[in-house]
């Protein structure tokens, strides 16, 4: 890339200590390689291996840390304290986006449609939860990404093992109403919603889980999504409202469902989405003619324009 020197010395932050470390290592290496190919003076920086105080001396940071510590406002706060511009969402938006319940509360308060939920524990009145949400439900740790610790529950006796599995990853666990229909993901880049992607996991997968996201090669990605032009536009507009309402900025991804009646339901937001070979952000960018190297440079360039922090 011409004029790559304007970025100065760039720390590509990846790895970290969260349950998503392995995904972050793959994503971060891909981003690092892309920036180096583009002539950027980029270096790997793993906060698990090095003290964040060593970030002094870098001119800006490209955050590719997934999950807690990297996607929840912590590293963003450190970078602001060090006065280092960084990619993506700021401290508050990151903290909200990492918390599925806070995200839903803000969406609900803004009259945005999101799947109904309840906080659950091993002591919860399961009959009351089933009466409220119906069956099936999906059990989720509130502060994990990449579908880690998630389970589909189809009968009441399946609650206990599902809650136990989720509790292994997070002290706070939620049950979310199962939306029967089609799953979509929408990438936001520089204030615009990119073409909607339809996710079609294989028949033997209950939902778009960790294996489907990162291990399997038989997941189908629909670009174009198959939605009508009006529904595509409606979902893109809904995504932008959802993205900005939680205080997200720069780049990210919103997951949504369309139920059997054609209604859209917001599920969650990812403020530092995956950038692996299986990941959805590169697929959406490719659909509008932005290759991976150009995508990484465009995200980094947000640190120059005020679109990021």
UniProtKB/Swiss-Prot annotation:
Pfam families: Dala_Dala_lig_C (PF07478), Dala_Dala_lig_N (PF01820). It is an enzyme of class 6 (ligase). This is D-alanine--D-alanine ligase. SUPFAM superfamilies: Glutathione synthetase ATP-binding domain-like, PreATP-grasp domain. Mg(2+) 2 binds at residues 268, 270. Cell wall formation. It comes from Acinetobacter baylyi (strain ATCC 33305 / BD413 / ADP1). Mg(2+) 1 binds at residues 255, 268. Binds 2 magnesium or manganese ions per subunit. It catalyses: 2 D-alanine + ATP = D-alanyl-D-alanine + ADP + phosphate + H(+). One of its GO terms (biological process) is regulation of cell shape. The gene is ddl. Disulfide bonds: none annotated. Its EC number is 6.3.2.4.
